[in-house]
Structures are given as structure tokens and as C-alpha cells.
Amino acid sequence: MLKLIKDSLGKFNLTLTDKQIEDIAFFLEEIYHSNQLFNLTGYKTKELIAEMLGVKTILLAQSLSYIFSNQSLNVIDIGTGAGIPGLIIKIIYPQLNVYLVDSNAKKITFINEVIKKLNFTGVFAILSRVEDNFFLKKYHGYFDYVFSQAVSKIAVLNELGTQLLKINGQIIHFKSRDYQEEIEFAKKHLSDLGLAFNNLYHYQFNSYFLVNVFYNKKAIAPQKYPREWSKIKRELIDDAKH
């Protein structure tokens, strides 16, 4: 795995240390082996794991260097799955306090084992859904940044994340080329959620194209948000298809 990562990263001008690359390779190797026992990811080969979970996530993390470098911030990865992108972001920006949240117990157990093996501090794997009352009460207004790759819809992550943000905190959406319709659909919910569109940034790394879409938290949202998942799914996912 280490050779795969090094060979793939050789074509990019990145400033990772040998230790960071080794830690990422170790993490991806753990994903590969654990994926033989239970479903951590749909990518089954070392080559696909190295490229799709490794290289693409490293490039995503590099695109955030202007906000994460040398900053001590509280950030949360919602629906982290196997720890992507949150744990790689932690490896690249070790001063961050990174919270990795997922409702799958096996995946959280896996992440905790990796954290222990890498002897990391300032990273926390939590078994929960972010819309659960206990989680919301504990982490209301706690985070500087909310992000997710698992929650693909802009309107959905905005609703799930707004109560967790500090005022002036930001939600980051990781998109590719198809995002304009999602931005338009999300507009009608922004005022209720206390959010405002901030900006979007395009990045081209050889054949990789990334778009980061940012929303700022301007006000505290009503207590009814986030709603039950069934309502979110019906109104923000199913309705958006029509």
C-alpha cells in the first residue's frame, strides 16, 4: 500500500512528510484487511482503495490547507464510515480536533482500533446519529467546521450540521462537477437554518476535479432542526428528485 500511495502521489506537488504518508498507507492497509471481514467500503482492491480513498482524499485535504493549516479547530465528519475523509484530514493537519461520527458500530470500532494503533490524540470516534437528541445537546454550537462525504446532498448536510456549528462556523460540501442544482434547491432552506452561502472553490489536480462549497452559520436555527431522518429524506432527498 505504501508503494501504491507514493507512486500515485509522485505526479502531484504535495508537501506531505514521510510519516504522514506512512500513517495514511497504514490506515488504508487496515481498511483493506478489515474489508475482507465486513463491509467497510465498496472498493475491494488495494489499487482502488489507494486511489479512491487515499489519493483523492489527500487532494481534498490539500484543498483545505488555507483554512486548516496551523489552526487548532474543532471539526466533525458526519457519516465517516471507515474514517474517510476525517482521519486522513487528521493525519495531514494533526493540530485539529477531529470528531468522526457514524451510526455503524463495526465501523466505529474499526476506527478506534486504528486510532489506538497510530497512537493519535485529538481524534474521537463516536457511535451516534447527529440528529439524536443526546448528541445535539452535547455538541450544540461546538464545531468550527462540519463536513461529510457520506451525506451527499447539500440541503441535507446543511440541516444536519447547522445546530452543531458555532456562529460564524462553516459547513463544507465536497462536490465534483454536478452541484449547481443542489445549490439552487438548498437556497429555500437557508434562512430557516440560520445559514448563508459563502463561496465555492474549484480545484484541478491533473485528472481530479474538486469543488468545495461553503456555507456560513449566521444565526441559531429553530430547535425543531434537524428534523427526524424520515422527514429529511422525504422532503430533501425524495422531493429533490422530482
Curated annotation (Swiss-Prot):
Asked whether the UniProt record includes Transferase among its keywords, one would answer: yes
Provide the GO MF annotations for this entry.
Answer: rRNA (guanine-N7-)-methyltransferase activity
Sorted UniProt keywords: Cytoplasm, Methyltransferase, rRNA processing, S-adenosyl-L-methionine, Transferase
Provide the residue positions that the database annotates as binding S-adenosyl-L-methionine: 79, 130-131, 149
User: Superkingdom of this entry's organism?
Assistant: Bacteria
Q: Which residues form a coiled coil?
A: none
- Enumerate the SUPFAM superfamilies for this protein: S-adenosyl-L-methionine-dependent methyltransferases
Keyword Transferase in annotation: yes
Q: Which CDD domains match?
A: AdoMet_MTases (cd02440)
One GO cellular component term noted in the UniProt record for this chain:
cytosol
Localisation per UniProt entry: Cytoplasm
E.C. code:
2.1.1.-
Function text? Specifically methylates the N7 position of a guanine in 16S rRNA.
Q: Which NCBIfam families match?
A: rsmG_gidB (TIGR00138)
What is the name attached to this protein's record? Answer: Ribosomal RNA small subunit methyltransferase G
Protein encoded by which gene: rsmG
